[in-house]
């Protein structure tokens, strides 16, 4: 035989238990070089700067038109 719960879990108890599993929005900051939104302590994906230094240089993509 399987184990059966002794009492029904109330909505309040269920919601209290699930309160820590909510998804959190990322904390975005603006880039000091290009003012686009980026994650803090990460290189800007638009300009390649981090702490006012150029870390990554992007190559220009040429269209075949």
From Swiss-Prot:
Any one biological process term the GO annotation gives: translation
Pfam family, one: Ribosomal_L32p
InterPro entries the record matches: Ribosomal_bL32, Ribosomal_bL32_bact, Ribosomal_zn-bd
Region (Disordered): 1-21
The organism's place on the tree of life at top rank: Bacteria
GO molecular function, one term: structural constituent of ribosome
GO cellular component, one term: large ribosomal subunit
Keyword annotations from UniProtKB, A to Z: Ribonucleoprotein, Ribosomal protein
Biased composition (Basic residues): 1-19
PANTHER family the UniProt entry points to: 50S RIBOSOMAL PROTEIN L32, LARGE RIBOSOMAL SUBUNIT PROTEIN BL32
Family membership noted in the UniProt record: Belongs to the bacterial ribosomal protein bL32 family.
Protein name: Large ribosomal subunit protein bL32
Organism phylogeny: Bacteria, Bacillati, Mycoplasmatota, Mycoplasmoidales, Metamycoplasmataceae
């Amino acid at each position: 035989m399987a184990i059966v719960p002794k009492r029904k879990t109330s909505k309040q108890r269920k919601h209290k238990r699930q309160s820590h599993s909510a998804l959190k929005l990322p904390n975005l900051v603006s880039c000091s070089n290009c003012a686009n939104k980026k994650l803090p302590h990460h290189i800007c994906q638009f300009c390649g700067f981090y702490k006012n230094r150029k870390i990554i240089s992007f190559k220009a993509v040429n269209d075949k038109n």
